[in-house]
Design a protein with these regions (language model features):
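Conserved donor-binding/catalytic core segment of Leloir-type glycosyltransferases
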Residues: 193-227
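Nucleotide-activated donor-binding/catalytic signature segment of Leloir-type glycosyltransferases, i.e.
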Residues: 237-262
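Conserved acidic donor-binding segment of nucleotide-sugar-dependent glycosyltransferases
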Residues: 313-321, 330-336
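Acceptor-binding helix/loop patch of EC 2.4 sugar-transfer enzymes
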Residues: 110-147
Length: 377
């Protein structure tokens, strides 16, 4: 089997794409990977070095949600059609909506892991109510582009039933819809290290959908480390330190710069608690990584987290900093409860969110789509 996969190098979905591609290749699938966005840095592609059976084609085409993306989208469509004609893959797997309507006689899978309309629905205060006419036209054009891709794809895959329902409500119900939960390879994470009394969170403070600022609104009884932040917010109520160490001798909030994957895995392994504060989290890869590292999960009470983690996480009242602080205090005071939640998260990740399970489900979908296309020929 030969699968042509597209991905983007600018978001956290690149980790998902890597898991998908690596998992397919190790199962004997030939993969051609086309990346959009920026040409990746060497650190972003080092995982490909010993992956035999992968043909990588980097491009700098804009992503469909970017300003002035329409011209790039047309050029990228021509490029993909030419590549499909040259390589004749068995399946096209797109991580962009717009190429779901590519006019080729090959099964097209679209992965719906996030979009502008459902993001704006979840984070309404992060964009102005009054939109300039040019922006309204761009918004309408974006919606129409995404709708066409969803409506004409042979299958649309979402990482959760919640995401699938939101996409269907915002655009249209796909002809064929599948929920395939994301996966990570547990071999990359260490769940056996002695834990430090600390809280870890991953994301940018300026990203309203991550709302990591909730962690700055109260003083906590143990250190908190936010990784990947590019700048602090104005006047946090909790004193901020700027280093990369998780545990400290004094209670504080540490703002860490971007970390390498090895550094981040070490932080996961040492952190006792992971704070999943997002109000919009369609993919949720950082939470998977924390769970595979046996962190206790404190999660914002949103439908996506409830679906993914069930009783394996401790939830705080939706978007409420005081409730988050109370949950942190609870797990700090009750070590047995903290260990129990860590075990629950680890067990749920091992049971439901491995790369192997994800690849099994994708291969089943691919084979079914190929069979349907062959029978119709």
């Amino acid at each position: 089997m030969h699968v042509l996969v597209t991905g983007d190098t600018l978001s956290g979905s690149w980790v998902y794409t890597r898991e998908l591609v690596t998992g397919l290749v190790t199962r004997g699938v030939r993969v051609t990977l086309v990346s959009f966005g920026d040409i990746p840095l060497p650190a972003q592609t080092s995982w490909m070095d010993h992956l035999h059976g992968l043909d990588y084609r980097p491009t700098a085409f804009r992503l469909e949600w970017m300003h002035e993306a329409e011209e790039d989208r047309r050029e990228a469509s021509v490029f993909l059609m030419s590549l499909a004609d040259e390589l004749r893959p068995d399946v096209l797997h797109f991580h962009q909506f717009s190429y779901g309507n590519l006019p080729v006689d090959i099964p097209r899978v679209v992965m719906a892991y996030g979009d502008l309309l459902t993001w704006r629905e979840a984070v309404p205060e992060d964009h102005p109510r009054s939109i300039h006419a040019i922006e309204r036209r761009a918004h309408t054009q974006y919606r129409d582009t995404v709708l066409r891709g969803i409506a004409t794809a042979d299958a649309v895959v979402a990482p959760s039933a919640w995401m699938l329902n939101r996409i269907s409500a915002a655009y249209t119900r796909p002809t064929r819809a599948e929920v395939i939960y994301p996966g990570r390879n547990p071999i990359f994470f260490n769940p056996y290290v002695s834990k430090d009394d600390c809280v870890l969170a991953v994301g940018r403070l300026v990203d309203a959908s991550r709302q990591l600022s909730l962690l700055t609104q109260h003083v906590h009884p143990l250190p908190v480390c936010i990784v990947g932040s590019e700048q602090t917010i104005a006047m946090p109520l909790n004193p901020i330190r700027a280093d990369v160490k998780v545990a400290t001798d004094e209670t504080s909030l540490a703002i860490c710069g971007p970390q390498t994957e090895a550094q981040l895995r070490t932080l996961y392994s040492r952190a006792a608690i992971y704070a999943a504060t997002a109000r919009y989290e369609p993919l949720g890869m950082p939470v998977l990584e924390a769970a595979f590292s046996r962190c206790a999960i404190i999660a914002n009470d949103i439908p996506g987290y409830r679906e993914m983690w069930g009783d394996a996480a401790l939830y705080f009242r939706t978007n409420d900093a005081s409730s988050l602080a109370a949950s942190i205090r609870l797990l700090n005071d009750d070590r047995s409860m903290r260990r129990a939640y860590a075990e629950l998260a680890y067990a749920r990740a091992r049971e439901r969110f491995t790369t192997k399970r994800m690849i099994d489900e994708y291969l089943h979908l691919y084979r079914n789509l190929i069979a349907v296309r062959t029978a119709a020929a």
